[in-house]
């Protein structure tokens, strides 16, 4: 298991890389988002990662409306993803995530699924050309369902899954982590950990919501998963990140 941190998009990326490395994390989940982590010197970032011997996973903007029914907006989103792939490729990053798009007025869930799959297909080909693996992150309905992810993986066999355990807890009778690992464990290549109280994506420190982390970790370990886990915890008090890491290590 490797434990990393998602850089806070409100803070300068350079400062985040230094803090993450100096506090002994294994990798940075490098998100490219405004205001603090959008425009930066790629060569400087690459040099820092190398000097700190810090590994990296690629995280993209979760709010891009790439299925919105206007060609100009879709093109802009596609251009953004091309930029992400280029930057991550320069940084030697091999895993890049993508979030489903929900911004489609008057579109049924079925049509949203179809439009997302079509976009994923294009981005996946671009990633493959750059020797990168694309992974889809679970979130809100209809992209909270293991069945929908089974369908996506069936249509795009070499795409992978980025499972956010916090997202799997939102508006569900039971956390869906077990269901995802039961049906798609061989497709899951990256995890996000943060806590919540079951209604919103709160990004709380571990143990501050209602997720049963000991049980979640038991499920994950039983599957044989031993890859990257990102702590996606947003708090001005960064000692909560360190405490969450210590709790994770203890529970693991």
Please report, for each region that a protein language model flagged, where it lies by residue:
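Short acidic/polar alpha-helix capping motifs at helix-coil junctions
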Residues: 9-13, 48-49, 86-89, 110-117, ...
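Hydrophobic faces of well-ordered beta-strands that scaffold small-molecule active sites
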Residues: 2-7, 28-30, 56-61, 96-98, ...
């Amino acid at each position: 298991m490797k434990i990393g941190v998602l850089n806070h998009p409100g803070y300068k990326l350079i400062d985040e890389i230094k803090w993450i490395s100096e506090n002994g994390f294994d990798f940075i989940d490098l998100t490219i988002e405004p205001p603090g982590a959008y425009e930066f010197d790629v060569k400087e970032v690459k040099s820092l990662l190398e000097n700190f011997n810090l590994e990296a996973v690629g995280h993209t903007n979760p709010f891009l409306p790439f299925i919105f029914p206007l060609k100009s907006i879709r093109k802009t989103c596609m251009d953004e993803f091309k930029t992400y792939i280029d930057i991550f490729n320069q940084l030697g990053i091999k895993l890049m995530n993508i979030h489903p798009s929900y911004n489609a007025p008057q579109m049924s869930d079925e049509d949203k699924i179809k439009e997302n799959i079509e976009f994923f297909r294009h981005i996946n080909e671009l990633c493959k050309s750059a020797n990168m693996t694309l992974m889809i992150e679970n979130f809100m309905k209809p992209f909270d369902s293991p069945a929908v992810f089974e369908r996506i993986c069936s249509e795009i066999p070499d795409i992978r899954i980025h499972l956010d355990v916090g997202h799997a807890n939102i508006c569900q009778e039971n956390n869906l982590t077990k269901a995802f690992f039961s049906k798609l464990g061989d497709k899951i290549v990256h995890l996000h950990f943060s806590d919540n109280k079951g209604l919103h994506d709160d990004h709380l420190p571990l143990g501050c919501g209602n997720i049963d982390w000991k049980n979640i970790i038991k499920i994950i370990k039983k599957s044989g998963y031993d890859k990257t886990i990102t702590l996606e915890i947003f708090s001005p008090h960064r000692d909560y990140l360190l405490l969450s890491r210590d709790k994770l290590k203890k529970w693991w």
